Amino acid sequence: RRNSGSSLVSSSSASSNLSHLEEDSWILWGRIVNEWDDVRKKKEKQVKELVRKGIPHHFRAIVWQLLCNAQSMTIKDQYSELLKMTSPCEKLIRRDIARTYPEHNFFKEKDSLGQEVLFNVMKAYSLVDREVGYCQGSAFIVGLLLMQMPEEEAFCVFVKLMQDYRLRELFKPSMAEL
């Protein structure tokens, strides 16, 4: 005979343990973010391990920016100026926007905020890196960033990924790295 009372207790206990783990994770990641300069230098291995285990959604945007040092970029100040310029890639970017995460609520509606900010970031990048310009596949990276952070921050992280982490090699017109 099954004791339904004990299964309720164990379920409740498991739920309580999970919420404590989540709370501990929030406290830990909050401390990491607040003490980033010290933590980055003194506990690099532990940070790598924690990142591999997963960054809580609430901290993802700031941690991704910290990990790639995007906040130190002067390019962020140029972003609004880049948006005022014309890119030779604009027509191509507009054509492809609807193909980027077409089922995701943020991007699926024509001329939605999601499509607008995706266009903005892709256009700005095409002006910063004229050799790469625009490549449709890169919009999926930017789209993922935009799901986590505002467009200026997404732009800075994308520039860092492309330049410092050599993703731009994958998107050069020759695509030699593929």
Regions found by a protein language model. Give the residues of each.
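Structured all-alpha helical bundle cores of eukaryotic regulatory proteins
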Residues: 80, 85, 128, 139-178
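Solvent-exposed, flexible loop/coil residues
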Residues: 101, 110, 136-138, 174-175
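N-terminal transition regions in large eukaryotic proteins
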Residues: 1-126, 146, 168
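Hydrophobic (often cysteine-bearing) scaffold residues that line and stabilize catalytic clefts
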Residues: 114, 118, 138, 154
